[in-house]
Amino acid sequence: MNKILIRNFCTNIKNESTKPLIDNIYKNILKDNFKIVEIKDCKNNRGLFYNPIESPTQTLSVINPKTNKPNLIFKEEPFISYPSIIKSNENICNHCLKEIKKEEEEIKQECEECKVYKYCSIECKEKSSIEYHSVLCKSTGSGFNYLEKHASIEKRRFPLLAGKILARMIMGYHLEKSSKSTWLPLQMLSFAKKPPPLEWKDDYLIFSRSLLKGINNESMKKKFDYDWFVRVMQILYLNTIGIDIDPNQQSTKMSSPESGIGLYLLTSFINHDCDPNAFIHFPDDHTMHLSPLKPINPGDEITISYTDTTKDLVDRRSQLFENYGFNCECKKCLNDLLIKRNK
């Protein structure tokens, strides 16, 4: 395993006292999807498995015979997301990342306070306010716009996602008096145990000056120290997904500067395979849809590709090692390796 990048898990150490807590957090992450999938231990530590409670012996087909359309395993809204930082976002909903078309201009919404953020609907505007914008809005004294400028210049989006995570945690403490629905679920995700690069210190300096100065509660402010920031960045490093909204496009986990980016809690448990049985796509907005590529039997692990499966063995493995810290040993890679050696 790469000494620079190691996949680690906050829940590696398990005992009888922590199991009920972990099971409860998994339940909150699964939500209604517990009827379809389950999180289980596997050779890659943990994975997501097809487990249809209401039809425990039924294979999931690629095409739904009733609608003659591709089947849907489940869909998930992101914990946080952010649009492209190199494309114009003037006509992009700041919440769901959907394009606001000219004919929809009349229903377009904006924040009355900052006049900066635009939304495609009242629903998106309200969700944004409840989840994070009430904390990040310029009218509250937040300096999130300075963090956005920094991220745009340096071409680094993770600090922006970290800012939204901070906002969601503050809103969680404000509305629920706990971190049950915010920080605890994030602790279940794998993270890259890598030495913090020097630029993370620069990012945190801007981050703290932009966002922490507005927090009056000193005990809460201390929660968001540099160690917290590093852990968040490590989580984002392994778990973010590129968002390319296109009803006809299949996506991999990797993002490009042109794409949006998001963190999805349940989807983060899906392991990689170079010959996956499922794929992610974004037909409408930032809501992730998971559909089968091949029939999936009850008990099968659901896998997606983190990289372009049309690339050759060397390119696939190099990309996966560089970005996710593992040497892929799926059946496709082992078979390709055998063919390569026999040539």
Swiss-Prot record:
Zn(2+) 2 binds at residues 111, 114, 133, 137. One of its GO terms (cellular component) is nucleus. Zn(2+) 1 binds at residues 93, 96, 120, 124. The keyword Repeat does not apply. One of its GO terms (biological process) is methylation. Gene3D superfamilies: 1.10.220.160, 6.10.140.2220, SET domain. Transmembrane segments: none annotated. It comes from the Eukaryota. Its EC number is 2.1.1.-. CDD domains: SET_SMYD. A zinc finger (MYND-type) spans 93-137. Pfam families: SET. Probable methyltransferase. This is SET and MYND domain-containing protein DDB_G0292454. It comes from Dictyostelium discoideum (Social amoeba).
